[in-house]
Every structure is written in C-alpha cells, then in structure tokens.
Amino acid sequence: MFRVLNDDVYSPAEIQQQNPLAFGKASSLFTDNRSANDQCETGENVRESGQDHVKRPMNAFIVWSRERRRKVALENPQMQNSEISKQLGYEWKRLTDAEKRPFFEEAQRLLAVHRDKYPGYKYRPRRKTKRQQKLLPADSSKQCKQMHIETLQPFTYRYGCANTTGSRMESQLSLSQSVTITNSFFQNEHHSSWTNLGHNRVTLATQISADFPFYQSLQPGLSCAYFQY
C-alpha cells in the first residue's frame, strides 16, 4: 500500500520531462510576474479609476465629528456606527454658535485649499446599484395560480347544444339568451320609432348556435373553452 502511494509522488525534474510547457508556465508565475505578486501582497489596486475620484471638502460638522467620533468609539467599543452617528448629531445640535464658529472657519479654509487644488471640481455622487427585487415565496405563487384557475369556468359544446358546467354559467347563459342586439340601434342612435327594431333583432342564442359548426370543424368531438369573470 505504501509503495503505491510513493510511486505517485513526482519530483520537479520528472514533471518537467513529462510536460515541459506546463512546468514553464507554472514557474513563470513566480519569476516573470513579480510585479503582480507584489501588488497582491501590498494590496495595491490595479485599477486607476479609484485614484481619479476626488473627495468633497469637509464641512463644519465633519470637521468637528472627526475627532469626537474617535473618542466616543473608544469610550463605547460595543456601540454601533449608526448609534454613534445619531449621538454625534444630537450633540452637534446642542452646541452654541460660538462653539461651532471655529469649525466653520476651518471648513472655509479647507474649501479654499480644495478650490486651489482642484479648480474645475464638480461634485458627482456615485450612483448606487439597484437592489434586486425579492422573489415571491413558493407558497404565495401557488396561491396566485390557484386563484387564477378558480376564476375560470369551463363549458363544452356537443353537437350544436351548449352543455355548461356550474350553476353560474347556467344562470348567466339563461340571462344572456334574453338579451338582444340590434343593428339599427348602433346605426341611428336618435331614431325615435321602436317599431322597426323587431325586424333587426338578433338574439345571442342564435349567434351561439351559428358558431357551433366552426368549433366542430376545428376538432371532432368535444371542445372546451374558458371564460374569465
């Protein structure tokens, strides 16, 4: 058993004889690419886009809170950064104008230095990445599908006779048969005589019976259609 394991161990010379190209590529990572290894060890960023970003000049509150934040963090190591920010904002509001004046003067000095150093500076805030929409849980999606299926009421056609399933369809079909559609009413809305309407009446039942051969020509036997309420 130990002999088999020892046979699998190869020296670098044997690896070079079997696959000299692979050995050369592996060795070049440590010899020819020293600059990349140095950057990884030192943590330098290869991209130069971050170096082009210019920070905004500090305002009076930031000048004051920079030192105050450190003291609060040292005094309360368990306090979160958000809680520290709330406390600093509360303390800053309680300061008088005389106490804030030195920090406003320092902020004005930093602003003048910033303008001299970056004359064409314009504040361009970074765009925040859009958060991905949370997916609905599987249970809610199933309930939506069930609700959609329940609203569909099927009925079938058989040899020119309408056979409906469900009391709702039967009641609505009986009501729809009594409703009439008149062509002359749409052609002339202001027609005063209702005597000529009887000649142009077309009931819904006759329209359904006229459409039965079309459904029978599509598929022999029974064909099922779904109506949504």
Swiss-Prot record:
GO biological process, alphabetically ordered: cell differentiation; male sex determination; sex differentiation
One GO MF term attached to the UniProt entry: calmodulin binding
Main location: nucleus
Posttranslational mods: Acetylation of Lys-130 contributes to its nuclear localization and enhances its interaction with KPNB1. Deacetylated by HDAC3.
DNA-binding stretch(es), residue numbering of this chain: 54-122
PANTHER family: SEX-DETERMINING REGION Y PROTEIN (PTHR10270:SF161), SOX TRANSCRIPTION FACTOR (PTHR10270)
UniProt subunit comment: Interacts with CALM, EP300, HDAC3, KPNB1, ZNF208 isoform KRAB-O, PARP1, SLC9A3R2 and WT1. The interaction with EP300 modulates its DNA-binding activity. The interaction with KPNB1 is sensitive to dissociation by Ran in the GTP-bound form. Interaction with PARP1 impaired its DNA-binding activity.
Similarity comment text for this entry: Belongs to the SRY family.
Protein name as it appears in the record: Sex-determining region Y protein
Source organism of this protein record: Cervus nippon (Sika deer)
Lineage: Eukaryota, Metazoa, Chordata, Craniata, Vertebrata
